[in-house]
């Protein structure tokens, strides 16, 4: 509410779910039709946005939460275990993956997770246990490069890099909504205090989408102008292109213009 006041928002509607997506796409007696949806939702809201994409700009695909912790044999098992669980507590349809080539690390991390689960509320514990045995889990690879290949193919929403030299690993990561480097940059920090936008693409769409930014609230129009001299300098080229393309009425305006 404070942020809304600061930026001058004057109307707020308390509504959610797929019915909210339909309401802003079509408009109702109480909710006006909108141009664009910004923000995440569960799998149902994400599906609704896709269905209604011809009626409203659905924005980036931001569905159930995802995290990949990319770790090597030098990673701290305690920190890996704690951060691996972060996104898993959002709900049973979230995805939390530990990707590593170190079997020894996995053998240390799993008991730590089990121990930490005893400190968590029953609701969140159930989410995490469900998540780590369905959409989440451990991906054991043969090498760090193979782990990175998996990450780039998966294109996660959140990604933590817990390798011996995270800044050397960074240039190899091509597809991720956000990339958090080192032992002291958990997702929690980025969500609440570091500054990067927490609305990120999910479902593999980090291959083609970026996080929400001010650009999502802006649009631009192309503007062109040619003086008579400028027109004369390029008219022949434009006419030739039109002829090659077989567009007669594209060519006539430049051929016949005085």
What are these regions (language model features)?
Residues 2-6, 29, 53-55, 83-88, ...:
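Short, solvent-exposed amphipathic alpha-helical segments in soluble enzyme
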Residues 6-86, 90-95:
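Conserved NAD(P)+-binding/catalytic subdomain of aldehyde/semialdehyde dehydrogenases
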Residues 10-13, 34-38, 43, 59, ...:
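Structural motif
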Residues 18, 77, 103, 143-146, ...:
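Residues at or immediately preceding the N-termini of alpha-helices
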Residues 60-134, 138:
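A conserved active-site cap/scaffold subdomain adjacent to cofactor or substrate pockets
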Residues 117-165:
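Glycine-rich, Lys/Arg-enriched anion-binding loops that position phosphate/diphosphate groups
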Residues 152-258:
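C-terminal core of ALDH-fold dehydrogenases
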């Amino acid at each position: 509410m404070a942020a809304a006041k600061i930026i001058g928002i004057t109307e707020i509607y308390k509504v959610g779910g797929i019915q909210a997506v339909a309401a802003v796409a079509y408009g109702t007696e109480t909710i006006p039709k909108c141009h664009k949806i910004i923000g995440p939702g569960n799998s149902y809201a994400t599906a609704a946005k896709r269905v209604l994409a011809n009626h409203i700009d659905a924005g980036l695909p931001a569905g159930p939460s995802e995290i990949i912790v990319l770790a090597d044999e030098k990673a701290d098992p305690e920190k890996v275990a704690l951060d691996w669980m972060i996104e898993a507590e959002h709900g049973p349809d979230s995805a939390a993956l530990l990707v590593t080539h170190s079997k020894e690390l996995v053998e240390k991390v799993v008991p730590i997770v089990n121990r930490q689960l005893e400190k968590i509320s029953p609701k969140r514990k159930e989410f995490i246990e469900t998540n780590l045995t369905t959409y989440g889990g451990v991906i054991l690879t043969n090498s760090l490069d193979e782990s990175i290949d998996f990450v780039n193919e998966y294109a996660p929403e959140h990604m933590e890099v817990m390798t011996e030299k995270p800044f050397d690993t960074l240039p190899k990561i091509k597809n991720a909504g956000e990339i958090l480097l080192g032992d002291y940059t958990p997702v929690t920090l980025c969500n609440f205090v570091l500054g990067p936008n927490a609305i990120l693409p999910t479902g593999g769409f980090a291959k083609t989408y970026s996080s929400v930014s001010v650009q999502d609230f802006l649009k631009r129009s192309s503007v062109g102008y040619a003086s008579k001299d400028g027109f004369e300098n390029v008219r022949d080229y434009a006419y030739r292109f039109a002829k090659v393309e077989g567009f007669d009425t594209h060519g006539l305006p430049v051929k016949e213009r005085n």
